[in-house]
């Protein structure tokens, strides 16, 4: 009767047991004493069978009522070991659950009604047991231990420590494994939940499957997927879990750790050393500066200035990095002289000799006012370029325009850039973000996104945002910008472009699973193109955040 009508009544006494008991008694009489009801024994057997079928049906209906009442009071403790997590090449396992329908809304509404409070609230003895735990915690510890035991033989055992409301899962009696097709992940996935409800634990489940997929000996090694996890907090449990799964999959040699909080064990990564266009270096650095109000003008100047420095370094055969850029921002004369030497020696070595001779004659009297305090060679170059205005090189011209600024004025307009660069080049972090490729004594690996993707690598990135949010945001966004650049390269040329013919001819389609915990902390201008256009390069983003409002507040829209 309980499931006959549209509106269910599951929060009530299980009256079905009454008719089930009566049916059992009637079946017993018909089977063992048919003469008592004036039945032929043969007919008695048939009547007993009918009563048993009816009684069994009523018992099932009553038991369903009991199950529902127990379900909404006590959420089952569902746990899986790592080996029990199903790994499929078609579907992604999410956990236990059900599709929310109208009946679940009705059931939840019924649970909120005060008339059924006796079925929804814990029993009197349960509440007494919890009170006794608090009261006798120190005086009778054995009693507290007994009452708090999670054994099924404890009738007042506490709820499992899973948090949340048991009503949400309790309104469905028959939960099943919930999966989503892997083909749908290219559209990206957003996981929303408040703090301490299990977002990171869900990330562990999904990352485990991504690491183990195609690692059971049946799949081609080239089908293995890239797994990258950005963790602003630097959760050690997540790091350990990823490493253990990599070992279990036989992929420990493909595992990289980049952790700003533990530079002694961290791999090294140059966030501005790889680029498709040299202008990307300036965008990655200046993108971390504020662009609100009057700061927008300083941000644009910082971009132009860093772009000039990066172009000059590349032309000189140097790899840009944070320390070198910070060095040249504070001493542009050095880079200007180095590039001028390179440029004039290419044009005519005698020109530089002439400039060197003029530099020896420079003094305070013949130095222009805006160049006071500059290196004598800078003054000599200025005089030569003034007299020979037909000589032009875009990089030399950019450096020359920066040098001509009054030094005091120049220091003011780069004032917003220097604090950021100081934070990125202070202490051991500088060794991570500007690796010395010639230091053979440093055995910490150096990685790039191109190398990681080609190796089908696994990367854990801990940004240690609790210690320094600015540095974490700057490094994270630079990594995203580098990844966007790499995605653009893959989209245009494929992953194996530039490799020998036999390798280049192989399929270069690879899935890149990007897991971003505390997504709102990482959200920036660099991340938006990664979401919008990264799917074409195989990037599949799974983002975890507390509320959608956090994302809106972060991007200001």
Per-region residue spans from a language model:
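Short acidic-hydrophobic sequence patches enriched in Asp/Glu that either
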Residues: 64, 234, 526, 543, ...
């Amino acid at each position: 009767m309980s499931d006959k009508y549209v509106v269910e009544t599951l929060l009530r006494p299980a009256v079905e047991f009454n008719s089930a008991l009566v049916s059992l008694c009637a079946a017993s009489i018909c089977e063992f004493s048919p003469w008592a009801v004036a039945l032929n024994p043969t007919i008695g057997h048939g009547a007993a069978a009918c009563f048993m079928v009816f009684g069994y049906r009523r018992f099932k209906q009553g038991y369903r009522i009991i199950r529902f009442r127990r379900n909404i009071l006590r959420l089952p403790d569902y746990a899986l070991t790592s080996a029990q997590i199903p790994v499929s090449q078609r579907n992604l396992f999410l956990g236990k659950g059900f599709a929310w329908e109208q009946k679940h809304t009705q059931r939840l509404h019924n649970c909120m009604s005060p008339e059924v409070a006796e079925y929804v609230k814990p029993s009197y003895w349960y509440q007494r047991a919890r009170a006794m735990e608090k009261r006798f915690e120190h005086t009778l510890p054995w009693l507290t231990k007994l009452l708090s035991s999670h054994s099924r033989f404890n009738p007042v055992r506490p709820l499992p420590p899973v948090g949340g409301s048991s009503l949400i899962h309790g309104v469905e009696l028959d939960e099943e494994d919930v999966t989503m097709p892997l083909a749908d992940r290219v559209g990206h996935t957003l996981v929303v939940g408040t703090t301490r409800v299990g977002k990171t634990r869900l990330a562990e489940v999904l990352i485990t499957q991504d690491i183990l997929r195609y690692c059971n000996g049946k799949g081609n090694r080239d089908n293995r997927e890239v797994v990258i996890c950005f963790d602003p907090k630097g959760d050690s449990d997540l790091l350990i879990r990823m490493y253990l799964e990599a070992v279990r999959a036989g992929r420990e040699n493909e595992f990289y750790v980049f952790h700003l909080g533990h530079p002694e064990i961290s791999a090294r990564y140059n966030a501005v050393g790889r680029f498709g266009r040299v202008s990307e270096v300036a965008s990655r650095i200046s993108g971390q500066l504020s662009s609100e109000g009057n700061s927008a003008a300083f941000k644009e100047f910082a971009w132009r200035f860093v772009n000039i420095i990066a172009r000059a370094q590349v032309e000189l055969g140097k790899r840009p990095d944070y320390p070198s850029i910070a060095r040249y921002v504070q001493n542009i004369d050095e880079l200007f002289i180095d590039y001028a030497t390179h440029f004039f020696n290419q044009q005519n070595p005698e020109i530089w000799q002439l400039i060197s001779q003029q530099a020896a004659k420079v003094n305070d009297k013949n130095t222009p006012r805006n160049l006071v305090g500059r290196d004598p060679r800078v003054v000599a170059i200025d005089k030569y370029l003034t007299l020979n205005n037909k000589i032009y090189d875009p990089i030399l011209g950019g450096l020359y325009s920066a040098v001509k600024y009054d030094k005091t004025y120049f220091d003011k307009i780069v004032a917003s850039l220097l604090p950021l660069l100081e934070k990125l080049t202070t202490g051991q972090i500088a060794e991570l973000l500007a690796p010395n490729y010639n230091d053979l004594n440093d055995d910490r690996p150096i990685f790039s996104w191109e190398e990681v993707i080609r190796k089908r690598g696994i990367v854990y990135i801990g940004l240690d945002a609790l210690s320094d949010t600015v540095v974490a945001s700057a490094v994270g966004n630079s990594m995203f910008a580098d990844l966007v650049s790499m995605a653009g390269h893959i989209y245009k040329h494929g992953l194996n472009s530039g490799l020998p013919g036999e390798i280049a001819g192989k399929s270069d389609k690879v899935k890149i699973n990007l897991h971003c915990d505390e997504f709102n902390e990482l959200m920036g201008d660099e991340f938006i193109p990664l979401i919008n256009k990264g799917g074409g390069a195989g990037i599949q983003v799974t983002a975890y955040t507390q509320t959608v409002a956090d994302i809106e507040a972060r991007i200001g829209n």
